[in-house]
Amino acid sequence: LVARKLNLNEFEEWITQEQNGYKCQVPEYRNIAGEIKAWNPYHGWIPMVLSADIADMISKMPLSTSISELQDVYNSSDSTIALSVNGKLTEWFNEHTDFMPTKYQFFSSKSELYRIMSTVRNKILDWALLLDENGIVGEGMTFTDVEKKTAQNTQVINNYTNNFYAEVSEIDVQQGK
């Protein structure tokens, strides 16, 4: 609401994407570290043995889902989260690895979700403090013309995005061992 009243389009767009999920690229802080495991019908989820280049490339997974979904997953998981790997990546693994055709999941610590939520919280707090430092206080949620102009000239938030290899469409929560 404040971003809209101050005509801060970039910040308003960022908040909207955090609330509703990202449709395209995600900011760097929304990439989580983890590892992809293959399903073995006799042993369950097993680590994949991959070349260092490929392992590095797939050791990060972007999370485009809304911040509220991340909060729900965080609250309902114990220590490990598992993300479904999309069909194209599954097909690539099945064609280019020595594994028999199978399914794959990306495993990560739930602390990665906490890191994302903390980053969002900190960005909002930093933004509020920056507005206050610049004299933008908005008495009763009403902003003067001077406050609006000052807000337009204040650098608010920078999100840096990177390209990524796969889309996350489902988050499956599995308890860590």
Describe the predicted segments one by one.
Residues 7, 31-40, 51-55, 156-168:
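Short, Lys/Arg-enriched charge-dense amphipathic segments
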Residues 1-44:
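N-terminal interaction modules that seed assembly of large macromolecular complexes
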Residues 1-6, 11-15, 19, 116, ...:
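Generic hydrophobic secondary-structure signal
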Residues 137-177:
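Long, low-complexity intrinsically disordered regions enriched in small/polar
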Residues 51-54, 59-150:
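Amphipathic alpha-helical coiled-coil/helical-stalk segments
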